[in-house]
Amino acid sequence: PPAVSHFFRFWLWLTTGMVTKAWAAIHRKHHAKCETAEDPHSPQVLGLKKVLWEGAELYRAEARNQETLEKYGHGTPDDWIERNLYTRHSGKGILLMLLLNVVLFGPIGITIWAVQMAWIPITAAGIINGVGHYWGYRNFACEDASTNILPWGILIGGEELHNNHHAYGTSARLSNKWYEFDIGWFYIRILETLGLAKVRRTAPVVRWQPARPMVDFSTVQAVITHRYDVMTRYARLMNKQLKRHLPQGVNVVKMREWLRLSPAELKQDEKAEIEQALEKSEKLAKIYHMRQELTHIWERSTLTKEQLVKNLQDWCQKAEASGIEALKDFSLKLRSYA
């Protein structure tokens, strides 16, 4: 409902001084250009220290980029109050918040206001945008460095589950595993129960069926829908094979980290070390290159249905003929996605 939507717009202005269009645009650009030089706040590019301690400054600098606002700010509110109050007087919301705190709580209200003013720069701009792309665990092998800082998203609205968010950016629910908790989803469900919100989309749930004898288009659709789950399972397969087949003298921890990344994310010297290690293990080389071939299937958006089916079927046949039991089992797993 418009009233609920407007409440959150008002709350954003009152507690942060941020403009809805700028917030949405910078967030969208971050997802579109993640871990590249165009990412407004990537610790992989700018360094963790820079994003952690200067995240708010990075946000403000990008908010002044008109190209970003025009390209990524589409579909955001553009009514009279947005133009004439929230945007024109963006800094006055936090002053009103200070006044309200002092009126309601007396002198202690100044301390409450100070905590409110520090909360977003430290937790969202610093911790989520910094640590959330540097340290933590990953449920999904998506193309960026996003991590889940903690399995319980309580203090920062569920954004602690940042890898889940990047894997399924349009999902209203950030928790994915049974042991994870997203307090933002808890609030959304309350609003939905009261008829004040509607959940449009959540992350797809993996379902299984007996392995199809041949790949069909429904197989391709299921694999592409669950591609992050597919690549996470493939990463586990690679980790097991690393322990068995990695040549002596090669750093297992370092190699595991590099193999988690796509070739585009690797430096030239890292690529060279990987190739040197793979030259000494035919099985590891096969598993590594088969992963690249698998990702190419859904990266080529111009392929027809028939081409997609053929490419996935060819991959499965190649895996089963490789003589590597783990690849044969993975082919069966792919054909079992429902």
Protein language model features and the residues they cover:
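An alpha-helix initiation/capping motif
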Residues: 45-47, 145, 181, 332-335
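A generic structural signal for nonpolar/aromatic side chains embedded in well-ordered alpha-helices
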Residues: 30, 154-155, 191, 334
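Non-catalytic, topology-defining segments of multipass membrane proteins
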Residues: 1-127, 171-314
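Amphipathic alpha-helical
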Residues: 310-338
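Hydrophobic alpha-helical segments
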Residues: 158-161, 165, 190-197, 318, ...
